[in-house]
């Protein structure tokens, strides 16, 4: 049975999964993904997964993280990353007509994350719902530091040394253990990009 790692999750997914998080939870290794190297051996995992984590790092931290993931992956191992892409922000601020699903996202995100959680920076209540949602995704109370574009993410992974770098639809994967692993729900899927990349043999 292959061994997998999930970064920034609150609970293990199964016997072949390890989990690392800043917070302390049962069955979870307490660790800081910006304090490298990661506390794992070289060539230890068949796969490394993170969802809506990489945007919490500055770009240089994200690059260093992916470099160290390459170290802990076995040859042929795969990293899967899910994140809110820059392109979705561009859609929100473009002024173009939104699809019904995108409009549904705006209403949900605005009512819960902007009004209730106050993700958008102060002083922007005069802006449109779309603009406030974009600001909320960009900043999230100062917790989001960098939103990668899809092409930028793929090019960076290739430059680091990964191969077979591919975008996937939400919940789909080239790795059986990664299929249907992402958080369920249309809202999450609408503002998520998915990339997988392989460590060379």
Task: Give the location of each predicted region.
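Conserved SAM-binding loop
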Residues: 2-89, 195-199
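S-adenosyl-L-methionine-dependent methyltransferase catalytic module, highlighting the catalytic core
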Residues: 61-68, 74, 78-201
